């Protein structure tokens, strides 16, 4: 499964390079387009007739070739995502953690494949540390100082979790008390990493303990 994710990530990287190169080519002729990949490409296609009048024939052929390459890459990406989606629907673990806000098809499959046996980790915090989503600790004389996140583990999975956390923060109609508190006390990026860590710990708890996701669940340390 992780191999499919690696292949998809590489194709997305190639697609981004092709789109940026296309924008640069058109910018040389004074043509600018809306930001965003989908919106920009749609505008380029809609303005093809206009571009033909402003761009030499040879360069217009290059532009059309570039658009075809981007379309082919998109088809390959869509196919890989379809295969990942089939696996996600058939796998009970992926299905269970997809209920967590911030975890979609890509994150669920990558997280389950990375985690393996959830019981190999003693706690959700240990799993979050494995992914590099906990702060570094330092200090002397019994005083512990928390630094930036360790960034250990797989950067791809960590990035998926952070993107998912940002989506939750920006789109939640009714944020949980925890989310409201962390967003009020911390900068947006720090809050996103903290929420990503919480999402990872929640996923571990569901898989290690065989629980279902409960939005209002609050963990309590034993006395």
Pin down the residues of each PLM region.
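Glycine-rich, often acidic, oxyanion-interacting loops/wings at catalytic, nucleic-acid
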Residues: 1-96, 217-222
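Non-catalytic, well-ordered alpha-helical scaffold segments
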Residues: 2-5, 9, 16-23, 60, ...
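Non-catalytic alpha-helical coupling and interface elements of nucleotide-dependent molecular machines
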Residues: 16, 27, 31, 132-136, ...
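Short helix-capping/linker segments at secondary-structure and domain boundaries
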Residues: 18-22, 77-78, 116-120, 166-174, ...
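Low-complexity, acidic/Ser/Thr- and charged residue-rich accessory regions of DNA metabolism proteins
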Residues: 141-142, 146, 179-223
């Amino acid at each position: 499964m992780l191999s499919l994710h690696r292949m998809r990530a590489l194709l997305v990287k190639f697609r981004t390079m092709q789109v940026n190169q296309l924008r640069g080519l058109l910018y040389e002729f004074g043509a600018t387009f809306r930001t965003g990949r989908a919106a920009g490409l749609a505008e380029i296609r809609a303005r093809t007739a206009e571009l033909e009048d402003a761009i030499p024939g040879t360069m217009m052929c290059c532009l059309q070739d570039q658009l075809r390459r981007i379309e082919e890459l998109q088809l390959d990406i869509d196919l890989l995502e379809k295969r990942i989606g089939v696996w996600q629907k058939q796998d009970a673990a992926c299905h269970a953690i997809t209920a967590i806000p911030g975890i979609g098809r890509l994150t669920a499959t990558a997280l389950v494949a990375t985690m393996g046996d959830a019981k190999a980790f003693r706690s959700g915090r240990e799993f979050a540390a494995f992914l590099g989503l906990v702060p570094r600790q330092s200090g002397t004389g019994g005083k512990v100082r928390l630094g930036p996140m360790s960034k250990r583990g797989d950067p791809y999975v960590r990035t998926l979790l952070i993107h998912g956390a940002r989506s939750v923060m920006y789109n939640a109609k009714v944020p949980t008390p925890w989310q409201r508190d962390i967003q009020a006390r911390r900068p947006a990026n720090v809050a996103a990493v903290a929420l990503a860590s919480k999402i990872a710990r929640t996923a571990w708890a569901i898989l290690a303990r065989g629980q279902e996701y409960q939005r209002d669940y609050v963990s309590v340390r034993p006395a």
